Amino acid sequence: MDARFRTITISVAAAAVLAAGCTSSGSSSDSTSPNTGTSGHSSMSQDPGTGPDASAAAGLRATLTALLSDHVWLAGNALQTAVLKGGDLKDPAVVGAVKALDANSVALSKAVGSVYPDAEKPFLASWRQHIGFFVDYTLGKATKNAAMVTKAKSDLDGYRTAFGQLINSVVPELPADAVAKELIPHVQSLFDAIDAAVAGSPDFQTKLAAAAEHMVMTADILAGGIAKNKGLDGDVDGTASTTRSVLTAQLNDHVWLAGNALDTAVLKGGDLKDPAVVGAVNALDANSVALSKTVGSVYPDAEKPFLASWRQHIGFFVDYTLGKA
């Protein structure tokens, strides 16, 4: 999927939904919290706007949500591509997917470096290292090399500890043990997605979406520590900030799930009944339902019309794809 198209789509969609969801007449905020769900890029040093959703703290949380969500999707797609190409890391499709993943790692390190300059390079080195361990796990699973799988798991356990110490050395408000513990679901959920990819399971996209969903919590924890450390204005966990983060995650996921479902349909020759296509479409629709429930949590009467409209526009993209194919 073209990265520029994905970013533009997220930005436009996020702006439209946020305009409807965060600026109701007669009230600057809503006391009803949205449903947490699956996963807009902005500067971590974003200037405060006029509302609580535009505070520096809210912007930080949304930025980390987007970047960390993309990390999971890009990692999952790169690893699945490697599996589909028989583990050939020199295949052009694999090389392209890995480059896109590394570009996200660089962007994430630069976001960290924008507030902690000395941490940018160590963060990038550490982040790239843990991706390599996931590659080892994937290749071990694909080749049925139990020793390789075991070592990859051990390496990732050690990485969690080292990464926690790195973050704590920069942000004392975030205990090393807590950061390491927070990474457990990230590692396990990505293991689950990789296992599904290696097995050719139709629920691969659902597993990957679950892994991406965890990044909402990870971003919240990291943003909370950084905001406190830097004295950023706004409330990281306020209703407006949470709404922005959830919508960022869900709209991000929408584009990834739609792109992956359409790509799967093309790879399967347009057979919409193929199990892999059905699984990808089901994962995409689950995201649509989650997004409609977020809208419905603040505007109950809009939930069903929103879902119907959202599903309709996805159908148009399916028609376009089948027409092109």
Which positions does each model-derived feature cover?
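Bacterial N-terminal signal peptides that target proteins for export
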Residues: 1-12
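Ser/Thr-rich, Pro/Gly/Ala-heavy low-complexity intrinsically disordered linkers and tails
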Residues: 28-43
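C-terminal motif of bacterial Sec signal peptides marking the signal peptidase cleavage site
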Residues: 18-21
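Alpha-helical segments in soluble extracytoplasmic regions
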Residues: 75, 81-167, 214-218, 258-324
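Immediate post-signal-peptide N-terminus of mature secreted/exported proteins
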Residues: 41-96, 228-279
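Preference for long, well-ordered alpha-helical segments
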Residues: 178, 182-229
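Conserved histidines in hydrophobic membrane contexts and catalytic metal-binding motifs
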Residues: 71, 130, 186, 254, ...
